[in-house]
Amino acid sequence: GFSIRPDTASAIRRSRALLADIAPERIWTEMKKLLTGERPAAVLREYPEVVGVFWPEILPMVGFDQKNRHHCYDVWEHTLRAVAAVPPETELRLAALLHDIGKPNCFAEDAAGCGHFRGHPAESARMADVMLRRLRAETVIREAAVTLVMWHDRNIPRTRSGVAHALRDLGERDLRRLLALKRADNLAQAPAFRSMQKEIDRAEAILDELLTESACVSLKQLAVNGKDMTDMGLSGPAVGEMLERLLSAVMDGALPNDREALLTAARGRRETARDL
C-alpha cells in the first residue's frame, strides 16, 4: 500500500488546526472511509493529535497505563488493536474505537496498585453519543455503536437461556456484532487472558442453534397473545406483564412454546396472584 512521506506527515500535523474550519458532516464522511478502509489502526496510531482536533476525548487514552494484569497495552494501543481485530463495518469499528473512551475518567487505583475502571461502559457510551452527535453521524449508526459500547463489558452468555435473552434484547445483527467486539476486545488484552475466545465460540454456536430452530425469543413468536390474556380476564398492564413472564419462561426452558401449556401456566399464575 501507499505510505505518507515524512515531510507530508509533518505538514498534516502542523495544519491539523484547520480541521476546525471543516463542516462536521465532511469530517464524518472521511472518518467512515478511514475506519472501514485498510489499516485504520495504523493511521490512528500515527495521527492521534489530528483526530483529537475534532475528537479531543481520545487524547487522554494515549499512553494511559491501565495498571492491570489483564492489560499489557495502554488504553490507546489496546483500542487500536481492537479496531484492527473487528470486521470492516462502520458500527463495529466505531464501537471498537470508542468502547474504552471513558476509561481515563473512571480510573481508580486500589491499595495494591491495581487499576480499575468501574462504570466505564456507561461513561464510554455517554461520551460516544456526544462525539458522534458532534460529527452529525447518522442516527442508526450512532445508536448501534453506542449500544455496543454500553454492552461490551457484560458477561458473555454461556447458556441457551442467556443467549436467548441477549438475542431478544439486541436482535441477531447486533448480538453478532457484540460477540465480534468482545472477541476483538479480548484479543487486545494480555496473552494470558485470551481464553474468552472459546466462550465466544460457544455463544455463537448457541445463537446459530436458536436461529436454525426458530426458537421463541419475542412476543410475536409466542404461541399466545394479548387477546388470549384478556379472554381469561386480564386487563391493562397485567396483559403485557403476563406475556412477558410467559416469554421469559419459554426462553429459560421452563415452559414449551405451546398454546395450551402457556394458557394453563397463565391461569395458574393468575390464580396464585389472586390468592396473595
Where are these regions (language model features)?
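Charged substrate- and nucleic-acid-binding regions of tRNA-handling and nucleotidyl-transfer enzymes
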Residues: 1, 130-134, 189-276
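Internal alpha/beta core interface subdomains
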Residues: 1-20
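Short linear loop/turn motifs
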Residues: 11, 57-66, 145-147, 237-249
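Glycine-rich, flexible loop/turn motifs
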Residues: 15-18, 54-60, 215-220
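Generic anion/oxyanion-binding catalytic loop in active/binding sites
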Residues: 16, 71, 113, 218, ...
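Conserved, hydrophobic alpha-helical core segments of structured domains
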Residues: 21-195
